Amino acid sequence: MRFITAGESHGPELTAIIEGLPAGLPLSSEEINRELARRQGGYGRGGRMKIEKDQVRITSGIRHGKTLGSPVTLIVENKDWKNWTSVMSVEPVPEKQKKIRRVSKPRPGHADLVGGMKYQHDDLRNVLERSSARETTMRVAIGAVAKKLLAELDIQVAGHVAVLGGIEATIPENLTIREIQERSEQSAVRVLDPSVEEKMKELIDQTKKNGDTIGGVVEVLVGGVPAGLGSYVQWDRKLDAKIAQAVVSINAFKGAEFGIGFEMAQRPGSQVMDEIVWDESTGYTRTSNNLGGFEGGMTNGMPIIVRGVMKPIPTLYKPLQSVNIDTKEPYKASVERSDSTAVPAASVVCEAVVATEVAKAMLEKFDSDSFEQMKEAVKRYRLYTQNF
């Protein structure tokens, strides 16, 4: 499975094309829209969420509620487009109109300046329109398709906020994937620890008053994954590496870790490695999951646990020092409509990109023209690994 996305933040629409789905996978617009709505929720979101109520339009690859095996095209219209038709016009406009909403003061921490240098743009809007986190709309739409495929194969995905600003949530032990899903959905900040929810909301409110932004850490878990996805034989076939790339590709994400992550550096090996046991009813399992479900770049049958760190959003209502690219004089950076934090929403995006990589790995290992054939292949493989 592969995909491509297109579209600008204030253009007419966002588009995604997914290729490589088997025929016969049940899929509806409603399932995708449900995930899009989750992305637009979360405490701390800005004014655009009141403007955009994202709805997907499927224009190819699905008939009567099932995939056809041909490319699937997803389109999400930008409701705010009517206010940007001249600024974002595809056709040439008079020089005077080009200056409307032109951006010449790059924002520190954003793609503005380097993107302008790279592509020789004298209007940095040409950079920020595509580098905007609005693109994650389509990553979530694609992730919704991936989640549907995984759910049909008894693989569940859940995400939550682990850290917001300087506030760290206590994560209850032994929760099922479904329990994590339910608890995070009940929280305005998608946290599993009710004792810190109000503190997080207060921090978000104060940060907004200060004209500042805050980042955090999100965690995604994937349960029911069979052992053996990915491979150790080449560096670029390791699934944990692919997931790490996907996580860091999310706007404003700067790092990823698996299991107990960087804490491994502070422990001896005897307190890191997950001991192997076997049971007739379940087959091979581990007594712990410090490695986050991976050994040698392959899934080992334990739940995948991955964390991503999101930096504070670089668009500040009290902008930092910058330089006008026309005059080279010091100026305060440009201000665009933005959020004080998007960490709760980012947990949904992180779920989506992780689900997409796991779905791609499943399709690679159990390559089938029809989804029914794929389900049978997965069933046989699970039985094989249990009795290995």
Curated annotation (Swiss-Prot):
CDD domains xref list: Chorismate_synthase
Protein name: Chorismate synthase
Record family assignment: Belongs to the chorismate synthase family.
UniProt organism field: Enterococcus faecalis (strain ATCC 700802 / V583)
InterPro entries from the UniProt entry: Chorismate_synth (IPR000453), Chorismate_synth_AroC_sf (IPR035904), Chorismate_synthase_CS (IPR020541)
Record field: catalytic activity: 5-O-(1-carboxyvinyl)-3-phosphoshikimate = chorismate + phosphate
SUPFAM superfamilies: Chorismate synthase, AroC
Entry cofactors: FMNH2
Task performed by this protein: This reaction introduces a second double bond into the aromatic ring system.
Keywords per UniProt: Amino-acid biosynthesis, Aromatic amino acid biosynthesis, FAD, Flavoprotein, FMN, Lyase, NADP
Location of the region described as Disordered in the Swiss-Prot/TrEMBL record: 95-115
Subunit and interaction comment: Homotetramer.
PANTHER family, per the entry: CHORISMATE SYNTHASE
Chain sites annotated for binding NADP(+): 39, 45
Enzyme class: lyase
Binding positions (FMN): 130-132, 251-252, 296, 311-315, 337
Its EC number(s): 4.2.3.5
Pathway: Metabolic intermediate biosynthesis; chorismate biosynthesis; chorismate from D-erythrose 4-phosphate and phosphoenolpyruvate: step 7/7
GO CC aspect terms: cytosol
GO biological process: amino acid biosynthetic process; aromatic amino acid family biosynthetic process; chorismate biosynthetic process
Record note on cofactor: Reduced FMN (FMNH(2)).
